[in-house]
Amino acid sequence: MKLWLLALCIVAVSAVCAAPVAFWASSPVGPDETVLLMGGNWGDNPVVELAPLSAPLSAPAVFTRPPTLGQWKQIKPVQITPNALKFVLPVTTPPGVYACRVRSADLSPQILLNAPDPWWLQGDEGKAASLGGWVRLFGRCLDMSADCALALRDPSGKVTPLPDLKGDQWNVRATVPASLAPGDYDLLLSSGWGTATAGKLTVIPPVKWKTDVFNLADFGTDPTAAMQAALAKAAENGGGVVYIPRGRYQIKESLTIPPGTTLRGEGMALVSLYWPDFETPPDALIVANDCAIENLTLYCQNHRVVIRNDPESERLRVNKVRIRANAFFMFGEPGAPFRGKNPPPKMMDGHVFRLSGRNYQITDCDLWGSGAVFSIDPHRFTGTKGPWHGVISGNTVAYGSTSHVFENLDGLIYEHNDVRGRGTSAGGNGINTFWNNFSRNLYYANNVIHDMYGLDREMMTLDAGGGAYFGKIAAVDGNKLTLAADPTYKDYAPTPHTDWSGAAFMILDGTGAGQYRLVTRNEGRQWEVDKPFDLPPDANSLISIAPHRGRHLFVNNRFEDGGAFQLYGGALDTIVAGNKGARMDGFFAWGLNPHDWGWQPCFNCQFLDNEITEGNGYSYRSAFLGAVTGNNNELYPGPLARAIVLRRNVLQSNARLRFGGTISDALAENCIVKNNEIGVDIRAAANGVLFRNNKFENVTTPYSGDGVEKAMIIPAPK
């Protein structure tokens, strides 16, 4: 590996980066809206040049004909900082994809606006899609017109458009034709405005388990013995269906469902399996690896885990299952005996699901747990086998402690769930990296989340301190970087892990600030990332290596009666769009250094078309939407939030906009604030902030705070 001494590195990087560079743009963006470009080396008096891509074609021709550029037009920026440039798209700009470049003494490489930006794909079998199954694609600017199309391209170059396409700008879904040949394909997307190759998809035959039926009624009258015998027979057979006819069945032991086996009841309302109130419950009531459970109800009292799968599991399906898991059934409070029986000492014990395997689906279930309901939580460093590629959809969820703990995600579809805190101590919901290097690629959409009054009551939070390095670099060679000092690994384990593959290698400040890459390999001071930086770091750059929580899509959810929706402790490339909130603490990004274990900034977070209908609640403050930071000190006083965009949000009934802390290069545009003393709270530590075309109705002081004088404010036309 080629290494450079620090002095040589500085000279080489300076030579490479003399021209302007733009590495991120705030897509989607429309006419008369502001584009935020992140980059640097703008030079003196830079101008932006914009050119449209050719008009869209229909599939499949759109996938085989390259687009052409129209005429370049120049636009003068409205705000320039060392790391960002803002300009307004002319009101006459037609919708579409545009090539953008910055011209000063030199010309920057092109960056595209509104081009499809695929983040990840997922099939009905996790990383794969089955013939006749589905594939979904997630990201930015995906379905922008009626000409949107998905297609598969085989190794010979043949392109097959996919039918049954549905979607929006954040996700697109289509059916995989049953007539295709199994194999590896390129997934192609046309948004209607532009095209992109979205990744590799493996197409497989439908998964077929054996259908031999083992009727519980044929195995005796003792329910526990009959169940164990039927499961054993299915295991001996290599799988099958253990069928449970109408009835109530007391089960006194833990059950292990064999691989390839479906535990199927006659109906959710017709079949009940119930366990006694164990003084010492088993580790799990049901161990479910590579199997399915459907059409029945489970009742239990004291429990550790109701349904568990393990890291080796590669397929789990749970559909139309009702679960009532109340460890405090017929008790008044934790630790207080009643009628000679003792309840658990703590409210937080117990999990309905504890999943560590891959390719799981929990759909159309009715779930109530006195502790946690969804613990996608291996509670350890997973390495190359994490709880990845899941679907949790269409469920009714009630809980006593927490609805979900999501740790080490990579591809989770969490949608159309109704989630209610039930109990005075029902707390919040987390997406975490306590033990691991990442939680990424989450689609969290069309859920209703409500009634959380316990603990921190976060309606949704990213969480966990952790880090591997803060400091300078000694050398750069493409995607290989040499740290200037030894890394220091910190996480929640007694002995922190040292393999940081998948973590975020972030440029906090200095040259290239606001960029990040994903770690692919590390050993001592030698680190490799997934691709070179567009604007490489140099001796002036400050680096933070910390867990990657990002590429999350929070879309069209409703949050009521709870605490904050917060991108806490760092978020990268995160969309918060179309959500509604009432009687909550608001929606905001929050960059900081939890526990002093690692600096975790917020980069590229966009809050679009959200609404807070009621800004009052239990909190000492009114609700707000925006960004804040914390924990800055003499070691690092610089920005912990960059490229924050607030657009078309509505804040009502004592809710407001807020930028507080070390925020750099942010935008608030076309937002509306109604019925409040203050419309916008802006603090002096924020730099490079633009407020444009925001409107205020019945607001005493539209702009307030010690940062007003530093901000650029362009009032809305009257």
Model-flagged regions — what are they?
Residues 18-71, 97, 104-150, 195-212:
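Beta-strand/beta-sandwich contexts
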Residues 75-87, 165-174:
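Aromatic sugar-binding surface patches on proteins
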Residues 228-233, 249-264, 272-319, 346-355, ...:
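Extracellular beta-strand-rich solenoid/capping regions of secreted or surface-exposed proteins
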